[in-house]
């Protein structure tokens, strides 16, 4: 159905999911609210080619910045875990979970501490690309935020931080890719 209107299928799926979610807006329960605190999604359309966008988003920890995107030092350990070093944001451990080149890449990281990657608390960051409106749409979804801590207040803070962080990071990615 989405292709009939010239809308990319992934974008159509997101729009359909958004409309479905909004139809239940007034029927949220406590369980729904808890689920809502588990996932952050955001998008940006960038005026660049898909190869340039992929070169950025497929690098482990590309989002670890404090301000504009900068140069990272990324090293792969013997355990398959990447150490991403940023002069301002510090060192972070990140694992590449899945990858389908030029389409989607997923990582695992622990947003509350830079020196560990505990299985039970790590979140999943999935980044997908699609060609839209003459540019490239970068879609980010971070899930698992409700379980980053056994402390509900700390998990809520991680969710709130992720919302602001991803909006800022995608704006920085747009500026970086369009300014090349």
Locate each region found by the language model.
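Acidic, Ala/Val/Gly-enriched low-complexity intrinsically disordered segments
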Residues: 3, 7, 11-13
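Hydrophobic ligand-binding cavity/cleft-lining segments
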Residues: 13-77
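A conserved amphipathic terminal alpha-helix motif
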Residues: 18-25, 144-180
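Intrinsic-disorder/low-complexity, polar/charged segments enriched in Ser/Thr/Lys/Arg/Asp/Glu/Gln
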Residues: 37-43, 81, 91, 104, ...
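Hydrophobic/aromatic beta-strand elements that line small-molecule binding cavities or substrate pockets
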Residues: 44, 92-98, 122-131
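Hydrophobic pocket/interface hotspot
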Residues: 53-54, 82, 96, 107, ...
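Glycine-rich portal/gate segments that line the openings of hydrophobic small-molecule binding cavities
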Residues: 71-114
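Beta-strand/loop substructures that line and gate deep hydrophobic ligand-binding cavities in soluble
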Residues: 114-164
